Each structure stands twice: as C-alpha cells, then as structure tokens.
Amino acid sequence: MAEFIYQMYQARKAHGDKVILDDVTLSFYPGAKIGVVGPNGMGKSTLLKIMAGIEEVSNGDARLTPGYTVGILQQEPPLDDDKTVIENVRMAFGDTIAKVDRFNKIGEEMCDPDCDMDALMAEMGRLQDEIDAADGWDIDSKLGQAMDALQLPDSDMPVNVLSGGERRRVALCKLLLEAPDLLLLDEPTRPRLISYAVF
C-alpha cells in the first residue's frame, strides 16, 4: 500500500481563546485531488497554511512525509516587488540556474594555465549530473511555455504594478514550475485559475 504524503492527527489551532481548528485528522495519498469547502472564517486558509508549513498547530500532529515537497498559492501571494515578472518566475529555478552559471564559469576558469584542472573537471562532472537530473539545460524554453500558458503580463513588467489576479497568475506560474509534490491552492474559485493549475 502506498504511503501517505501528508498526515494530520487531532490537530488544534487556537489564537488565545479563539479556536480556529479543533481535532482535525486527515491523511492524503500522493496524487489525491481534494477540496476543502466551507463558509468564510471557518479556518480553511489556516488549515492550508499549516499543511504548507507556514503555521504550526497548537496541539496534535501535522507532518509532511520526509522526501516530499509542498507549495502553496496563497490568496495574497508573496512576490518580490523589486523584480519583474520574469525575474519572479525564474526564481523557481534558482538553484539550477546557479549550477548552470557555475558550470559555465568553470569553462572560463579552465582557460587559466595555472588552474587545478582535475578539481575543475570533477566539479564540472558533478554539476552536469545534477543539471541533467533537474532537466535544467532548457530553462528559458520552459519559462516561455509556462508564461504563455498562464497568459502572464509582459515579462519585463514590474510585479508591483500588477493587479491581484495577475499577481496570482505569476505566483501560480512560479509554483507550478517548482513542481511540489503537494500543491495547495487557497481560494482557487475562478475556473480559469483551476484550469491553469492542471495545464
């Protein structure tokens, strides 16, 4: 039987005397698609933030199974307002981009006759394996496809001038490219947003 990707057992969340969630028990298998519905103010967003690791339970247990990743699209998604649309989306590949940059830099360093060629070759080989494993040689193409599919604003537009819906699409694009094992969408009430999430 497959292992659960996420489990919560008798979880309680309270702020002082105000109880937000009480005695919540749930388990999800990988690949499950589950909706949390209810009136406003009933703790749906709090539940998702706990699952994303943004908030902690007051009592009980809530845990993501080790080896899995989680990502959340919040109602007001945090973006870097000092960056453009493309710069925010590229952050999904931050680690891989750094490895590609280092790989290219090693090529330059090899031109130095005094370099430690064996050490550079070993590092280059390790980086190539890691970049290959992440399918990281074609990042610009992936970015273009994802940004087109989600109909993002112009790539050079600063995110601080975007509407709320545009900001959510930028954040969703970044999140989908990060490809977390557990994807949480807070208030994906618009059919278009849901269709974007499954593109």
Predicted segment positions?
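Single conserved hydrophobic/aromatic residue that forms the stacking wall/gate
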Residues: 188-199
